[in-house]
């Protein structure tokens, strides 16, 4: 075997407790994660102790298994890692890496056109089996898998559906999104050190728009150096001409906000003329650099008749569409989003027949989309596998669930994680503790969000009006389908949507 190196495009985590070893290792060029356990995990743990682009002595890997494996056996294992891009023989030049990424980007475009995904394969946080397996294991040891950083509420778009506190939804309202005492880069450095020590796998950067944040590039560098997987949610406008710079930090994925292939509709939602063109220019740059991208598209009244065009648009850029019918109200208590932007009536039923959305209702889905829920389980992973940090440093369970467990200006994340009584109470809250949820026929169709309930009622334990409405709509649609009454009436989704007119932005 030639000299082996740890490539600059891998990251991961190693966890050992109670004599059990587990590891997760990413190939960030190909967007793949791999799970390891026992001795193979110990070897991966040894690999992760070396810096990126460092040569790895075989003897160090032999010693990581307490000499239980010979050098020949280690070489065989390393060859397997090399075959999937987790190690390299020799140090690759930047020109070779760039060419490989370009090839992968072209392949991703081709695959997005050819591959037809089945119902329910399109999740908001798309993960593979390796990530799910590792997440389930570390959850048992009370280790969060992902922490979201809301870096700032400042943004270069003015989206009508934005749930950031202080967001304005029309030209007559004044935005107060920028009036925040945001934590600085020193707070983030301490936070990242804490999260690395705990064993957190992934960081998500969001906002506002994260690239409006001062010191964003320094922060991304610190995340990369500490071996976190990195997801980013952005509109992309601040990344024109900077995609290649970001690509060198190997984000696991970048989610771009795209609301319609119709430029007029998209720009009316962002309230920034030319925003779709700019976002798509950035999408092309990401595709050319082989960075995995998603087109994130919430459905609302404005784009309800053209949202499906985002899926076709995504194919041109090798992107994965993330289309969702669920809207979230502002965390400051403004419920105008679900009250005025939420699709309803016959139009909602037609959209729920779209197999490209997670809340699809149809015979192809088990029980037409209804799911029996274990009342001894939590509704979601907010506050357990997922945590959130606001721009001011508040530690919350999710960016759409504004209950606070502490603030990083006062205490470290580790102190809050280990000692917050309110966090402990929340982590032991299960469906059976809720006042009404799980007691109605519609509840099997509910995509319950404790954060939405908190925004509406000041407590997550009361049923959300918006969630209940959606559950009722899905249940009633399922009953109609069982009786043979399909709102599509034998037509395609696109043909049925043509019978409706988009709600003008001025009406909101």
PLM features per residue range, with description:
Residues 76, 86, 105-245, 249-253:
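Conserved alpha-helical substructure of the radical SAM core
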Residues 402-508:
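Flexible mid-to-C-terminal extensions adjoining Fe-S/redox cofactors in radical SAM and related proteins
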